Amino acid sequence: MSMPVATYGCTACDLSRWDAGTWGYRYYLFGDIKVRMLVATGWCHTCVDLGVIEVLPDADSELAYQRKLETFQAELSEVLAAEPPRKRWWPFQARKSVKQENLEYEVESAAKALAEYQLARKALSSRVSRARCLRCGSEDCLRLPPHQVGYYDMEPLPVPIGFEHPGCGGQLTIHCDDLRLNMRLTDKAYDLEGLLLEGATPE
């Protein structure tokens, strides 16, 4: 199946990189458990290029996951409270509303995401190294600032993301011009310090 790809560019040079490097499933081995690795596009000062950077879990992000779950739980409680009480003599189960089904799904998904994030924090609690570039393994890298990707924009113009291109001075931009890629995605295993395990395919 093909997927839309976004392109990073620069306002002052011909830099052009896709975001497809973040695709695929990467995980840490925590004993016999596979713990999902979070990644994002970032800048590696060692590679002097854009690349895939680890995103290490932290307390603030865990709190955000928790609040998201609590929000969905509160909305679901309101929906359930608004339903008329079931008649004792009625033998059939009342059919759930679409809103209730959607909220139950959101609660389940948010609870799963929170549990996975908490497991990642536990697995990496004794980690010594900082987030790494997954191409070269360097810790001298940083994640790009938060930005949106308009995969389905009617007019896909390059949009600055608020990051100066190191060594160039231009502003990095992102846009999606309907280009789609059909790639075979592979799983990649890493140790708890973010190093690719032997036998896995390098970035």
Predicted regions and their residues:
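His-enriched metal-coordination microenvironments in redox/metal-binding proteins
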Residues: 1-7, 203
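Flexible coil/linker segments and helix-coil junctions enriched in charged and small residues
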Residues: 70-113, 133
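Basic nucleic-acid-binding interfaces
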Residues: 123
